[in-house]
Design a protein with these regions (language model features):
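Charged interaction scaffolds used for protein-protein
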Residues: 1-11, 31-57, 63, 75-116
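Short, surface-exposed, low-complexity cationic segments
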Residues: 18-37
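Active-site helix/loop of acyl-thioester processing domains in fatty-acid/polyketide metabolism
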Residues: 72
Length: 116
């Protein structure tokens, strides 16, 4: 699955595939699926109920989101630099915009395909 979104005036491609969880573990040393589960409070951003409480925010580890974003960008474009250098190219990395855009990609690793 692939998606292109605009961040800080730049078109950025994000992609997931079967190797995404293994690439994540190789880069960051932690399990991709466990890390995604840490972002569960973000599900509140889907649909009409788009509010996250201060308590939800306290339990979020935004480093996980930055890491997952980088893995998806690296999967789409193997030439991008290491995570910190990649993030430094953006003057802003608006979480409120990026998170909802990438949720489907994150969740695609958990979904099955429907058989006809």
């Amino acid at each position: 699955m692939e998606k292109t979104i605009e961040i800080d005036g730049k078109k950025v491609r994000f992609k997931t595939n079967g190797a995404t969880p293994l690439r994540y573990k190789a880069q960051f040393g932690t399990d991709y699926f466990k890390e995604i589960l840490k972002l569960a409070p973000l599900q509140k951003l889907q649909g009409d109920n788009q509010s996250i409480t201060a308590d939800d925010m306290q339990h979020l580890d935004f480093e996980v989101f930055y890491n997952i974003s980088w893995i998806m960008a690296k999967t789409a474009d193997p030439t991008i630099p290491e995570p910190l250098e990649w993030l430094e190219q953006f003057d802003v990395f608006p979480m409120a915009v990026v998170i909802p855009e990438l949720q489907d990609l994150m969740l695609s690793s958990f979904q099955t395909t429907k058989k006809n």
